Structure formats: C-alpha cells, structure tokens
Amino acid sequence: MESLLAPLKIVGKEGMEMTCADGWVRRVYTILAAYIADFPEQCLVACCLESRCPQCLVLRDERGSPAWSHPRDQKKTAEILRQHAEGLKPTAFVSQGLRPVKPFWANLPHTNIFRCFTPDIHHQLHKGIFKDHFVSWSTEVVDGGSDEVDRRFKSMSKHPTLRHFKNGISLVSQWTGNEYKNMEKVFLGVIAGAVDERVIRAVRAVIDFISYARFEVHTERSLENMDRAWSAIHETKKIFLELGVCTGFNIPKFHSMIHYVPAVRSHGSLDGYNTESPERLHIDFAKVPFRAGNRRDYTAQMATWMSRNDAVQRHEMFLRWAKGNGIIEKEGEEGDDEAEPERKRRRKEGDIEVRGCHGYKVAKNPGYGN
C-alpha cells in the first residue's frame, strides 16, 4: 500500500492540474479520504489488535457500552509504533492495543487514517447486527424456535411491495442485501404476539437505526433520529440478557454503530461506502473464473480467463460501435439476399436510408413556461 499510495505524497502537497467536470482546469490536491475495508483489514491498517476498535481507544471489554472514547491520533500512534520498532517498549503500545505493523499512512499529507474508515451497512448492520444477532436472539425467545418463525413467515399476507418468504428463513444459507432488507420490513410483524414487548421495542430500534443509516440524503433531524434510535438500542438491549439468549454485547459490530453519525457528518451519506454493490464482483471475478478452470494452479488460470473475457468484451463493444456508425454492415444489409428486395423497394419509393444518426428525445411539455 505504501508503494501504491506513494504518488499521493507529492500531489497532496504540491497538487496537480486536472480537468473538472465543468471543463475548467484546476489545481487539485488529492488525498486519502476514505478507506473501505472489512473489520480485520481495518485493524490491520490501523495497526491494532482485532480485540480493539480501529477508530477509538475503547477498552476491549467495554465495546458494548454507549460511552464515548477518545479517538485514535495518527501522529501519536505513528510515534508509538516507531519507538516500539526501535526497542524502546512504550507503555502506550500495550494500553492502546497496537501491534507491530509498519504504517503505510504515516507520511501521507492531510490524512487521518482512523477517520478514513467508513461504516459498512451490509456486513455490520444487515448481516451482523440484524441477522446474526437480533434475529437469532429473537428466534430463541419465540416458543417453537425457528420452526415457529418459519411458519409465521409463510403465513404473512402477500403484498406487491413486500417479498413473501414462502419457505421461511431458516433454510436460506446465502443471503443478499435485498433479502436482508425485505426481511427487515416484515420481521416485526412476524414476531408480534410471540415475544415480550421489550424484545419488539429492541428490534424496532435496530430497524429504525438501519433505516436511517441507509438514507441517501441526511439532515440534522435525520441524524438526531438516528442517534435517538442508537440510544434506544442500548436502553432496551438488556432484555436479551434477562431472557438468557445472549451473554453480552461486547461485539465489534455492535460498537461500530457509535461511529455512524460522525461518519455521516465527515463523509456524507453512507450508501456510497456500502460494500453491497461490489459484493457482486465476488461472483464475476472470483467464483466464475475459478469454476472455469480445473482447480489446479487456479490463480494463473483465473488471471488468464479474466484477461480473455476482458478482450472479448472490448471486441464486442467495438463491434457495437462500428455497427452503430456504419463502419461495418449490420445483419440483413449488404450481402444478404433476403434483404435485397426490401432495399430495392425503399429506393424505388424514395425512402432514405440513414446510418449512424443520433436520436434525441424531446419532452412532451416544457419544464418552464414561456
């Protein structure tokens, strides 16, 4: 990563001229502002243990608490790592939960790597907090367990805007982002009347938080409601301890929710940093190329398959462009005996054949009156 981001050290200080979207050339100072990664990679980049938070100094046993902790400081962390590398053994190395990894971000200008980490709605909220924890805990509370929950999912009324889980949810092994969202829409109705009212309030607080986190545009009011939902989660979570379905909330994904509102304020809406969109690339660039080979020396075979597939796609794009501009004949034109009578008829009737013309759509009614 240090070699990959080395050009940012120069352009981050001196800048470079770039053509902007409006056509004007401006001097731009490019910096590392966002880093999208899963939790293990975030801890590796932050040079901290996976039992600690990569963004703040919360203690390893207090990640389930709603209390705020001091954020990590990049300059101080880099200095502690340097001292440890020289054998000085600073006490902060252990107290801050660091590990001996060379930080590639130490000399990047105008960068705070700990504030670059962005929330991951797909893995942290949809899959982690909701599905792996609150759905599992709620299912254990229901009399009859997963069988009763499946029966209730099957009994849900059908609606055009809602997905009907006709086989329940216990047999689904691979979930997509859309399936998580569809389950969140109806889960409160599924457990209504089957669990304690306090469980419903806790699940509702989680769903409210996830809904606000998915907003494409935020206001101060939406952020306040999001923070209020987060507070409601901590106020109602103890019901799961009382019912004995969980042993605690010292969970990294549970603690990560405290950083969502600050991330929105610093980076904007979180939909642009969600890993749900690139998750589909695992199929296109990993699973499909792997299955295309014989599983031996699969790395080289996958690279060859992807390069050939890319070449085929580029050639296909060229053929589309060439046909659209009349460089090569389309099917059913020159050289096609079946199309010759139709072409003669059009010439005889005076029809004009136009190739490579661009079409434009005009609004039926003007946007602004004269």
PLM regions: where:
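Domain-level detector for long, ordered catalytic/regulatory cores in large eukaryotic signaling
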Residues: 1, 5, 9-186
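Terminal interaction-prone segments of large eukaryotic proteins
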Residues: 88, 99, 107, 120-370
